[in-house]
Each structure stands twice: as structure tokens, then as C-alpha cells.
């Protein structure tokens, strides 16, 4: 177990699991830190600045985009690694407190669920209000969406971002500590800002954002499937759920993304509803259109996934500690 022994954060299950639980608790109680102190905002600022330096020709755009991504990812990884090295030399309680303050901004479960609930509240007031609120959450055109489609989009966003904002950062944290979580969050932020095909914000991102999109695909591959499994397990056991398990792979591959379809399909099957993007894909097409109660049920499923993930993380920390000793 020489390799494990070389990873200092696996030596103490208490530090690893304590940091995870405390970060989730602070997220639950307080939500996001102010933007000027938010590391994900800093990442976004760097990516926004870098985007202005990317040339237009495809080959140059790809090379410059890849270089800018690698520089940013390398900087955040090594800064996080050095911070973690210093913090692990402190007493355990100080290490947990400090690591929590650094891990928490990389997790955004409270913000995600609040935004999704806000869409439902706005939709209860009017369709236009629901569309306007949804536009803050998704990048798709919301102008022509029906009430059901607005709700579908909000629930889809909850499922997809449950992976991006909670499961995947924790997955990489459990494997590589703070550097792993920071590295993933940078990659996911880059994909959210650059990972498009065609025009967006006056620029063709087909080549400029290709590296960012593929990197996120690789880093999200395992966590997305873990999210799907946890969503399915979090549903109520029944014969219908058994059939849903059999349909999961088929439904998950209906989306263009190799990863986002998994948590979205799992959410659709667990709720028994239809989710989709008009003209692009439909998940669990035989399901009923979601009503307001389905949004609340989706949030409950998300809560169960977060708690299950924290429990799995604690068990993983104990296993790491035993293997490293």
C-alpha cells in the first residue's frame, strides 16, 4: 500500500469525513460565499479573460483553448495541493475547519435546489415568470416553452447539476483530496462556459471549447453514473422501479452528452415522468408530464442522494485509512 501511504489525506478518516460532513452542513445552513470570495467565480473570471485571447481559425482556436485550460487547471491544482499540504500539518480540528472553508465553495446543493424551487414558485405565478426564472438556470431558449416544458427543464437541471455541483466534486475529493475537487470544478466551469458547438456570445466555440468539453466528459464519466445509481436507489422500491432499472441505460443514451443523460434519465424514471428538450430528446417518453408536486419530489430525491453520498464518503475514508496503515 505504498501508493496510498503517499497520499497524506487518506491517512486520517476523521479529517476526510469530518471535512465532507461539515462542508455539506455549512452549505445547508449558509449557502454560497460572496462572489468576491468565491473560487468558482475566480475560475470563471480567468476563463472569461482567456476567452478574449483565443483566435478565430479552428486549429489555433483549439490549441489556444487547450493551452488556456491546461494553464488554469494546473494553477488551481498546484495551489490546492500546496494549501492542503500546509493544512495537513495543523492539528486535526484546525485541518478540518480550514479544509471545510476551501471545500464548501466547490459544492452548491443549497443554491441548486433553491433555484429549482424558485422556478416552480415563479411558474405558479405565471408562465412568463417561470420562463424568466428558468432562464437564470439553463442556457436553452425558454421563450416558447410550455408550463410542462419549463418544469421538465428545471427538474433536468436539478439532476444534471446534482452531479456537477455535488457528486462529482465529492468523488474527486475522496480520491485526491482538495486538489481533485478543485481540478474537477475548474474543468466543469470551463465546460459550462466554453463547451458549446456553434455560436455563443459572438464566438464560434466548436473548436475553441472542444478541449474543455472533452475534459469534462472524461472527468464526469464515473460520477454521472454514480449519481444515476444513487437517484434510482433513492426512489421507492417497487415493480415499476425494477423495470426502470432495466430501462436506465437505454434512456440515458438518448441525449447528445455521454454523461448528463444518466442522472436526467434516472430522475425521470424514479419520478415516473417525462423529461426532455423539445426537438432534441425525450427521456421516459411514456411517462406522465410533471406537475408541481414532482419538483418537490425531485428535491427530496436529491437530498437523499447527498446524504447517501456523504455516508459512502465516510465509509470510503475509513477504507482509505485502513489500507494506508
Q: What function would you assign to each model-found segment?
A:
Residues 191-192:
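Glycine-rich phosphate/dinucleotide-binding loop and adjoining beta-alpha-beta core of small-molecule
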Residues 1-183, 195-325:
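Hydrophobic alpha-helical transmembrane segments
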Residues 188:
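Substrate/ligand-engaging "lid" and interaction regions
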Amino acid at each position: 500500500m505504498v501508493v496510498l501511504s503517499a497520499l497524506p489525506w487518506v491517512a486520517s478518516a476523521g479529517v476526510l469525513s469530518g471535512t465532507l460532513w461539515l462542508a455539506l452542513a455549512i452549505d445547508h445552513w449558509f449557502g454560497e460565499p460572496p462572489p468576491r470570495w468565491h473560487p468558482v467565480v475566480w475560475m470563471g473570471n480567468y476563463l472569461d479573460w482567456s476567452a478574449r485571447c483565443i483566435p478565430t481559425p479552428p486549429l489555433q482556436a483549439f490549441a489556444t483553448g487547450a493551452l488556456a485550460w491546461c494553464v488554469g487547471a494546473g494553477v488551481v491544482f498546484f495551489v490546492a495541493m500546496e494549501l492542503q499540504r500546509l493544512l495537513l500539518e495543523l492539528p486535526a480540528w484546525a485541518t478540518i475547519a480550514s479544509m471545510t472553508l476551501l471545500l464548501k465553495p466547490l459544492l452548491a446543493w443549497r443554491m441548486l435546489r433553491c433555484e429549482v424551487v424558485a422556478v416552480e414558485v415563479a411558474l405558479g405565478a405565471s408562465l412568463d415568470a417561470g420562463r424568466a426564472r428558468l432562464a437564470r438556470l439553463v442556457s436553452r431558449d425558454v421563450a416558447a416553452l410550455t408550463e410542462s416544458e419549463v418544469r421538465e427543464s428545471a427538474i433536468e437541471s436539478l439532476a444534471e447539476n446534482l452531479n456537477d455541483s455535488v457528486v462529482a466534486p465529492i468523488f474527486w475529493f475522496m480520491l485526491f483530496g482538495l486538489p481533485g475537487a478543485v481540478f474537477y470544478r475548474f474543468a466543469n466551469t470551463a465546460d459550462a462556459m466554453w463547451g458549446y458547438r456553434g455560436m455563443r456570445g459572438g464566438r464560434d466555440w466548436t473548436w475553441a471549447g472542444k478541449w474543455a468539453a472533452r475534459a469534462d466528459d472524461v472527468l464526469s464519466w464515473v460520477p454521472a453514473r454514480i449519481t444515476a445509481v444513487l437517484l434510482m436507489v433513492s426512489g421507492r422500491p417497487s415493480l415499476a422501479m425494477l423495470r426502470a432499472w432495466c430501462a436506465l441505460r437505454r434512456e440515458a443514451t438518448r441525449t447528445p452528452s455521454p454523461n448528463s443523460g444518466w442522472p436526467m434519465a434516472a430522475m425521470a424514471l424514479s419520478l415516473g415522468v417525462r423529461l426532455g428538450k423539445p426537438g432534441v430528446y425525450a427521456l421516459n417518453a411514456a411517462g406522465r408530464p410533471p406537475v408541481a408536486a414532482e419538483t418537490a419530489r425531485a428535491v427530496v430525491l436529491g437530498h437523499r442522494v447527498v446524504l447517501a453520498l456523504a455516508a459512502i464518503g465516510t465509509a470510503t475514508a475509513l477504507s482509505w485509512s485502513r489500507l494506508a496503515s
